[in-house]
Amino acid sequence: MIKLKSSEYKKYSKFLNNLANKLTRFYFLKLNKPFKVSNKLKGTGYDPVTNADIAFEKFIRKEISNKFPTHQIIGEEFKNKKTKSDFSWVIDPIDGTRSFVIGNPTWSNLISLNFRGIPILGLANFPILKKYYFNETDKVCLLYTSDAADDWFC
């Protein structure tokens, strides 16, 4: 099991909690409008990507890079940012792009922080529902509402 200092967990937890709120605001201010859909697969099959996928990933990468410039970033829409850091962020900017395309609100932004390849923190943000789940490895998972006043164990 990976053990980080409590202060490190707090730093990363605070960052992810703030990022969840920023992502929800970003969606409603910038992305809650008509969008383009294209197919990432050439030939047979269908793997949709929207301009919102790309915008979300750019936004997330910028937030991470500004706060943790030496960390690696692994994303779905762009090349991986490789560094010598033991920390890596894994991003799925829109998990459930097909749901996003048809207007189903169950799509989410998924972000994981890994230390030496092992997940230590995770975020599943649901902007339309104004809720997000936050988890620290081997700890309880929390559900936050847009007011952040009510926390529930999940």
Describe each region flagged by the PLM.
Residues 1-94:
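N-terminal subdomain of lithium-sensitive/metallo-dependent phosphomonoesterases centered on the IMPase/IPPase/PAP
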Residues 78, 127-128, 153:
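Short, glycine/serine-rich, charged loops/turns that create anion-binding
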